Amino acid sequence: MQSSTQKQAGSLTIVGSGIESISQITLQSLSHIEAASKVFYCVVDPATEAYLLAKNKNCVDLYQYYDNGKPRMDTYIQMAEVMLREVRNGLDIVGVFYGHPGVFVNPSQRAIAIAKSEGYQARMLPGISAEDCLFADLGIDPCNPGCVSYEASDFLIRERPVNVSSHFILWQVGCIGVADFTFVKFNNSKFGVLLDRLEHEYGADHTVVHYIAAVLPYENPVIDKLTISQLRDTEVAKRVSGISTFYIPPKELKDPSMDIMRRLELLAADQVPDKQWHFYPTNQWAPSAPNVVPYGPIEQAAIVQLGSHTIPEQFQPIATSKAMTDILTKLALDPKMLTEYKADRRAFAQSALELTVNERDALEMGTFWALRCAMKKMPSSFMDEVDANNLPVVAVVGVAVGAVAVTVVVSLNDLTDSVN
């Protein structure tokens, strides 16, 4: 066994092909597939398989290690090992697994861990999972009101807790208690055990959305709104397959803690949240979703302000050269160029004569802030507060609507802007 501190020839990169055929392979993943010495893949549709073969002629199908009645764990160990053998031979190996390569995938995690322990460079790149597709197709946001996700058999075996006030996602509901593999439909004879647990937690009439993400680009996803009791019907249960996922909406809403909100200074001592206000859109799958209009008083007040909107003084518009854009694009999509840059950032940056001095300095420094300052037009007021590298301290805020943004809505009487 080689020491984990040694630098070995050979590397392993694990990528995901997404769920929908071809289209969900990221640019980052594709660049590694094309540059690999050899590609090992486990994908579910032949179009993606053919696409991989077109991008790299040296491909091996890992699906050959499955067999009827064969324990899936044996298959996973073998999948990992055939990739590792080639890494040990000094090759740059890419493993492609459908969906997100680290979500409900054992051989990818095993291979990465072993490769790292033996001193090889190993990395996993993110991909699009069935859960990502579910969020998009069902129109739910895991942050509101939170989300719990379990593998169905593990949920039963370890008696995992349920939070009935959050989203609940169950994976692999079509193979309850199944440890081996079959090339045909799984025998889901223990499905009733799952329904018993769900009925105990939610009641027989609670909604369950049976979901299967679309694989082909011209398909629609399977979205069946059912109840737990309806799933006990034999014909309905037959629709559930090895690629099915269940989404169970919240049974109840949870009120915010006034004490915590005041400790976080989100509310003044004399303020209380307006419990009649709900963020739009509400959860269409919930059994008792409130009727919320898209343009209530709060929304109308915000929209009125658009009429007087001006760009803030501290807004930072893009202001970069084509040369800088081209170099950063290549660093993102060309693994070999990225390796060259990481080996000697100074030499790489100084050789890029088409860049401005500021752009070369930022590329040499290599930090997010340095690049942002070189590629954005920074207001002079930002220079009032700088870091050790004489770069402005800038807060970058995304568009995520978190619990704070959703919860901290006070009474309409406290709004300073009104709708005429």
UniProtKB/Swiss-Prot annotation:
Domain of life: Eukaryota
Any one biological process term the GO annotation gives: methylation
Ranges in a coiled coil: none
SUPFAM superfamilies xrefs: Tetrapyrrole methylase (SSF53790)
PTM-bearing positions, type N-methylglycine: G398, G402
Keyword Transferase: yes
Family, similarity comment: In the N-terminal section; belongs to the precorrin methyltransferase family.
Domain notes: Within the homodimer, the clasp domain wraps around the adjacent subunit to position the core peptide into the other subunit's active site for iterative intermolecular methylation.
Name of the protein this chain belongs to: Methyltransferase/ribosomally synthesized cyclic peptide gymnopeptides precursor gymMA1
